[in-house]
Amino acid sequence: MEKYDYSELGLKAGLEIHQQLDSKEKLFCRCPTLIRDIGDSDFEFFRYLRATESEMGEKDRAAVEQTKIRRKYIYKAYDTTCLIENDEEPPRELNKEALDISLGVSKLFNMKPVDQMHVMRKIVVDGSNTSGFQRTAFLASDGYIETSEGRCGIDSLCVEEEAAQKIEEKGDSIVYSLDRLGIPLVEIATAPDIRSPRHAREVAEYIGMVLRSTGKVKRGLGTIRQDVNISIARGERVEIKGVQALDLIEDIVRREVERQLNLLFIRQELLERKAFVCEEIYDVTGLFMDTKSKVLQKGVKKGSILAALLKKFNRLVGKEVQPGRRLGTEFSDRAKTAGVGGLFHTDELPNYGITEKEVQAVKDAIGAGPEDAFVMVADEPEKARLAIEAVINRAKEAIEGIPEETRKALPDGNTAYMRPLPGAARMYPETDVPQIEISQEYFDSIKPPELLTKRAKRFASESGLNKELAEKVAYSRYLPLFEILLETYTKDANVNSTLIARTLVGIVPEIRRNGVETDNLTDEHFKGLFAAISNQEIAKEAIQDLLTALAKEPELTVQEAISKLGLSAFDPEEVENFIKQMVMEKGDFIKDKGPSALGPLMGIVMKEYRGTVDGKILSHMLKKEIDNFIGQG
């Protein structure tokens, strides 16, 4: 049961899906799309970035805010990166493979391609691109998908280069890795047709399914990211970036709606109180020269403790806007953009070693009354000033309502401030890459892949897989291998579709859950495994043990692993003699239990021959001997 009636609230939401493509080369250079270990980096360099004017003489507001603090950006480079990633050389032509994949995706979304594709530069000054901009190209528009809530428009599909990956922050420096920079990705933007949290998840799941249907997208953490645009009636558009887990999308939408409703409540309360924000910044450093608060002692040492007066804000700064987050948290997020650790406000004081007497001293110094609040920042003078100015601006926005902004998704479903929404000044033409013609003939030559949903139904109807297994295989990373193996063993007596599927999506995950790294298993390992089963060299009961051994020692061949585990072909006469001997020894037990003795005795036989002889063969041989023994009795 949903907490809110989203249609009554006027919820409008849209998604932007960013998916890395699994092309051989990067988008504007011929470097491989390999993800490297940071320890493999063999050199590094650094940059300082600043906001520049667009062709119209304007500066993007998000870029201006991000460059208020001078940050050093350090880039880790590899033997698989080149001068283009370093921004020391112009880009090459756009990757044809990436373009073909993207056009195939556009067909699955019923989109119309542009006649001529132009590459643009999108200003990005958070350090994630060495050049200070990201290259992007608008490829297709006017698409749609059908959902349980009706048709959802797909407004645009762009081809972009991936950003560098942030490794760590060290003071005023941020370290990035260049292995990811330039990997091709598609950005798919829906229309604001999403009407509820569940609908948002449904749309995201469908888009993800379409992308995986290509077989040409990267998989794993960080290879796909969802951004969510949300607004409600009387609110403003807020963009939430970096939702990596599909399970989080519903919570993100619910909690953003809750945040906006609470901000509107705070706004109404502030208006009724006739609240306002004082422009003056107060230096209260002298009031804390003898403070016992360790946090403020550091502020005194750094040189500055500044305060701002919020008239009629008392008890509203501590008002919760999302679970565990308050209006004061929103103020703190803004302060942190200046490089400070956070702030203090009256709704949480006295605390942190700050006494009631010290709180009153600040109130007296700045003229705060019982209905007022104040915020306080302690840091180096310039950082503290920028931080308190940011808080003053955010407090003013609280009186106006909901600010348009870009926020980042947090692991618990909440969000935190990142930067203002970018404006039109963010984008300008890329002059180093020529336009690309998309002719009707070229577009018609692109054949869209079969959707995974259709493929799963085909596996169920044609290959005899049950629905659950068919869906698991269709959506798994082993889909291409499954289809190869299925074709190889179509008429094999010992290897069928169910065995192949259970191995790939049942046994392999089980091995992984046991703590063994299964990424070491190659297609050749699986091909060798099923060849051995087909040739009756091993039984299917040996699959888990054999794959575990290969995962631990991937340099082994299947035959070498079989020998090492002692899983050689069985001698039927030897097995028959073993079973006859056991039946004679367990004669009294068989006389007592009759045919039901089969189960317990089967355990003894399997313990001896598991992985060497197929269980069905052993069961048949044992039953035959038990029946003979009972018949002779």
Curated annotation (Swiss-Prot):
Keywords: ATP-binding, Ligase, Nucleotide-binding, Protein biosynthesis. It catalyses: L-glutamyl-tRNA(Gln) + L-glutamine + ATP + H2O = L-glutaminyl-tRNA(Gln) + L-glutamate + ADP + phosphate + H(+). Heterodimer of GatD and GatE. The lineage of its organism: Archaea, Methanobacteriati, Methanobacteriota, Stenosarchaea group, Methanomicrobia. The keyword Transmembrane helix does not apply. One of its GO terms (biological process) is translation. It is an enzyme of class 6 (ligase). Belongs to the GatB/GatE family. GatE subfamily. Allows the formation of correctly charged Gln-tRNA(Gln) through the transamidation of misacylated Glu-tRNA(Gln) in organisms which lack glutaminyl-tRNA synthetase. The reaction takes place in the presence of glutamine and ATP through an activated gamma-phospho-Glu-tRNA(Gln). The GatDE system is specific for glutamate and does not act on aspartate. This is Glutamyl-tRNA(Gln) amidotransferase subunit E. InterPro entries: Asn/Gln-tRNA_amidoTrfase_suB/E, Asn/Gln-tRNA_Trfase_suB/E_cat, Asn/Gln_amidotransferase, Asn/Gln_tRNA_amidoTrase-B-like, GAD-like_sf, GAD_dom, GatB_C_1, GatB_Yqey_C_2. One of its GO terms (molecular function) is aminoacyl-tRNA ligase activity. One of its GO terms (cellular component) is cytoplasm. Pfam families: GAD, GatB_N, GatB_Yqey. Its EC number is 6.3.5.-.
